Amino acid sequence: MRCCIRLLPVLVALGMVPLTVEANEPGLTPAEVVRRYSRTVACQIHEATPGYRQYATVTLRPDSSDGTLGVWLVGWTGDLGCLGGNATHLVQMTLVEQRGFSRRVVSPVVIDHDPLPGLVLNGLRDIQFSNGVLTVRGTTGRQAFGTFQEITLRYRYRDGWEHRDRRFELLP
């Protein structure tokens, strides 16, 4: 009983301390969100090398005046799922959105880890977005095997909730 009486002030004091638990660290850029995400879902993630990009980011929809609703696409290369075989180190595109709160409160979140249909590249040269069209420049194959190719793919971006299942359409 005496032990409980001595412990009571400590428990009361602990109950008065505000405990803050956040699952989302505020203030991160879309590229940093994807950098952290990629390290949890992939292996063999290397820094950019000359002529190739890593964590290249394009803005698809700018933040609104209150700092919400921005949408970005971040391109990176790695072995998604850590499969560890030939041709498993590929270009990945990750769609990120700032939802509901400004970046001061929460960072953007990953909303789609595979938004681009038909994208199979093993090197990312560049991504650009202009007038609703996303251009992805990259490489496939290996020079040592004589299969190396430079590839350019173009996608139409369709914004809005009604297109959430198919935001990008591969253009001819």
Specify the residue positions occupied by each region the protein language model found.
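Bacterial N-terminal signal peptides
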Residues: 7-17
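Acidic, small-residue rich beta-repeat scaffolds with periodic aromatic anchors
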Residues: 24-46, 122-172
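Short consensus segments that form the blades of beta-propeller domains
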Residues: 79-87, 141-147
